[in-house]
Amino acid sequence: MKRKVITVIFTVLLLSAVFIQPTHANSAQRHWSGTDSTGALVKDKNCPLVVDKELLTFDVQEFPKNYYNSIEEFLAYTGKVTAEYTFRNPADYTVTATLVFPFGNLPHYGEYIYDSPTDKYIAVSDTEKYGVKVNGEPIDVAVRHTLKARGTPFSLDEDMPKLTDGYISDSFFRPDLPVWVQQYSVEGIGAENQAATAAFVLREDSSKTRVLWAEKNGIATLKDGIRISGWTKTGDTLTVYIFGEPPKDGITWSLYENGACKKKIDGNITLKYSEQMTFRDFAFREYDNSSGISESDWYNAQVAFMNDGSKDWMYGGIYTEKSAFSLMRWYEYTLTLEPGQTLTNTVTAPLYPAIDAGYTPSIHTYTYLLSPAKTWAQFGELKIVVNTPYY
């Protein structure tokens, strides 16, 4: 069957004036990541549906702010992309296909917004503003979520397999895997040791034992193990999670003068609290039922996050940064076409640019990936329209 492959990246750079010049300021953030959008994908292999044409419309009537004071202010932003597909079923039988449309993570400037009444950062959901239609009528659509590092491009080979129905099966991180949470108190470090560092060494079989220290700053490879370390001071509480079998020699702490971990100093690190849970309990510690994220998508993202933190380290070490946990959103919906039938499928999604404030005026970059077109049996005409006053 004929296949037309489109693998280009369509990038729109919009400036708020014709002439730009670089600007620099010390100790100030100058770049905020946006999100990449992409086209509709078919989940089913060997699907006979073809795309006769696509109308891709970018509506950029305003630029987003790099900081929002409220959720309402962020949700008032109007940037969007609309993909209108004309699908046709050339087969002599009815085809029901499940489609997904990935539309990126929330941007840096909108993922979490400070809520002054609660003194907390609130996760934002913007998906109710958008949706999917067939022949002009809204249809049921699920919003799915998968782990995706900010600033990384969409990859069919890497991102599609993460979109799993139900709970993922993993060789190590199983729902019933035992997890111990241990909390240690730090005492007796002299005031002169401003760069005091706590550390312990792991020499475990990572297929049986893995260890995560929440407050760590670094991991160093030793001849026969790894050393996990982090800055500390008197009064600190250190939290360690042990997955699977406990380390053969437990967690044995040492205190050092600084991060080089050469000269030991006086002080005590004492176990004050220990509790056993399951990995499922661990995975859902911060799950919010009102977030719109399904339990299975959240769990699968946690498994992927922990595996990403384990893959570069031997001897049972896990290195993760809580701030690096970010989710990409997908629309998932079903189309049914009778033999020879043609229909119009319209998908509208938010459009968030990357912002580079290192120039005056700032540069806003909108990226839309066309490579998913290669998942279709045939892809015909593509028309791109940009509606904006900034040209």
What are these regions (language model features)?
Residues 9-18:
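Bacterial N-terminal signal peptides
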Residues 1-9:
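Bacterial N-terminal signal peptides that target proteins for export
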Residues 22-391:
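Lumenal/extracellular ectodomains and adaptor appendage modules
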